[in-house]
From Swiss-Prot:
Belongs to the beta-defensin family. Residues 1-22 form the signal peptide. Disulfide bonds join C33-C62, C40-C55, C45-C63. This is Beta-defensin 103. It comes from the Eukaryota. Induction: By bacterial infection and by IFNG/IFN-gamma. It is found in: Secreted. Highly expressed in skin and tonsils, and to a lesser extent in trachea, uterus, kidney, thymus, adenoid, pharynx and tongue. Low expression in salivary gland, bone marrow, colon, stomach, polyp and larynx. No expression in small intestine. GO terms for cellular component: extracellular region; extracellular space; Golgi lumen. Exhibits antimicrobial activity against Gram-positive bacteria S.aureus and S.pyogenes, Gram-negative bacteria P.aeruginosa and E.coli and the yeast C.albicans. Kills multiresistant S.aureus and vancomycin-resistant E.faecium. No significant hemolytic activity was observed. It comes from Homo sapiens (Human).
Length: 67
C-alpha cells in the first residue's frame, strides 16, 4: 500500500509544469489564435497582416490578414 503513495508522488512531480515553460498556456494561446483565424508568426507579421494577439509567452505573434 505504501508503494501507492510513492507512485502518486512521482506522478505528481512529472505533471507539475516547470516554471517559465508555460506548456499548457502556450497550447491554449495557439488554439485561440487559430480559432480567431490567425497564424503564429515567429518574428513578426507580414506587411499585409495585423497582430491580433500572442501565440506563446516567449513572444510569438498571432497574425491575420487586414480586413
Amino acid at each position: 500500500m505504501r508503494i501507492h503513495y510513492l507512485l502518486f508522488a512521482l506522478l505528481f512531480l512529472f505533471l507539475v509544469p516547470v516554471p517559465g515553460h508555460g506548456g499548457i498556456i502556450n497550447t491554449l494561446q495557439k488554439y485561440y489564435c487559430r480559432v480567431r483565424g490567425g497564424r503564429c508568426a515567429v518574428l513578426s507579421c507580414l506587411p499585409k497582416e495585423e497582430q491580433i494577439g500572442k501565440c506563446s509567452t516567449r513572444g510569438r505573434k498571432c497574425c491575420r490578414r487586414k480586413k
